[in-house]
Every structure is written in structure tokens, then in C-alpha cells.
Amino acid sequence: MAYTHVQTFNPEILYAFDPLNEAGNCSKTHSHNFLEISILLEGEADYLVDGERQDVGIGTVMLFNPGVKHAERQKEGTFSHQLHIGLTNVSLNGLPRNHFPNKRALLDLGCYADAFMEKAWRVTKEFNEQRSEYQLMGKGLILEMLGLLLRSLEDGSDNTLPPALSQTAVRQQHLVNHAVYYLENHHSEEITLEQLAQQLFVSPAHLSKIFKEATGLSPIHYLIHVR
């Protein structure tokens, strides 16, 4: 199945950074209300994911959906170089907002692993060097990485969740996606809630309710955020 609509799929990159972790470094157990991808570029690390410890090495890719608790530490005599990417405004067909269809955080990319890691290193270079248009270049690479992740989850993986939304929720998801698309492409114009609702053939009250449930913002506050 196709998880994305090219016209409306437009994730927001919250951060992309690549820390060097020395022995003794650790993070407390935490979770996010957005997507996070963690990639082991070099070295090894000890991760705790939903209460289960895992030793991970070079090439390991973990994708933490919202609410997935995780922590990490560096054992004595070890180090790691990791890339962490935070993403929001991610909408995939049949799934709750900001969720990917993986059952487990630890991913097996199979034949896509080499291409994925090559792009991860390029993302690291773009965000570290910050040359002209690095954010655009970085976003393009991250979109390709997301495409590879989705392909790996579709190709016979036992780590793939089935669509979790009802037909009503799917219709609401499409409505929110098109509202977001319209706001992002007309943000310089004067737009009222009534005008937006008219464009989408729904009532202002209904649009406002489902938009805020999906994004945490009202349509007009989202427009202000985009501006």
C-alpha cells in the first residue's frame, strides 16, 4: 500500500544532530510526542527500549514512535557517534499522526541499509557544515531516508503494523492533510476559518475540532506558526 500522498506529505524537521558519546555518557528514560530516528554511525551503545536492554552497533537504526520510552548509556571502554532526527507533521495513510507502521523500534532495513546509511552520513555533513541551503538539502535527504524506511517495512517485514484507523478517522486525516497543504501554500494571504472550511466543503466548527485534535493547534494558530 502507499503510505503517503506526495502532495500533502511534508514532515517538519525539528532537529538533526550527531553527538559523539564517550564512556559514562547516559540519558534518562524519556519519550517524545513526535517521531525520532536514532542511527548508529560509529561505535556501539547500550539502549533501553520499553524496558528491554539492547546492545546496538554500527548501522543500527531505531525509530521511536510517540510515547515509546527509551534511554541510552555508554559502557566503559565504548563510544558511539549517532545521528538523531526529530520529525513532526508526519501523516501516513491509515496511521495516527506522527506514527510509522513499525511494531518494534529496532529496524532491519535489509537491502536498503547501505543506501540509508550513505544518506545518513550526508545529512550529518549538511547540518554540520551549514553551507548555503543546507536545510533544503538535508530535508531532501531525510525524505529519501523515510522512503527507504517505509520500503523496508513493506518488503515482507514482520515488524509492520496494519492500518490502525477507522474509515471515519481516515477521512478526517485526509481532510487535515489537505487543510495543512492549503495553509502552507497560501500562508501569505488573509485566510479565515470560514474561508478555509469553504475550500474543503466542511463546516468551520467540524474543521476546527478535528484539526486541533490532529495537530494540537487550531487552523489559524497553525497558519501563524507557518508564517
Predicted regions and their residues:
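Generic protein-terminus/edge-of-domain signal
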Residues: 1-61, 68, 74-76, 93-106
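Short, conserved glycine- and acidic-residue-centered signature motifs
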Residues: 33, 172, 176, 224
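A short hydrophobic beta-strand segment most commonly corresponding to one strand
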Residues: 77-95
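Amphipathic alpha-helical segments enriched in hydrophobic/aromatic residues interleaved with Lys/Arg
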Residues: 98-156, 181
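Cytosolic nucleotide-utilizing catalytic cores of signal-transduction proteins
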Residues: 133-138, 168-174, 188
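Short, Lys/Arg-enriched N-terminal segment that forms or immediately precedes the first helix
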Residues: 159-167, 215
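Basic/polar phosphate-binding segments, predominantly the helix-turn-helix DNA-binding elements
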Residues: 178, 182-226
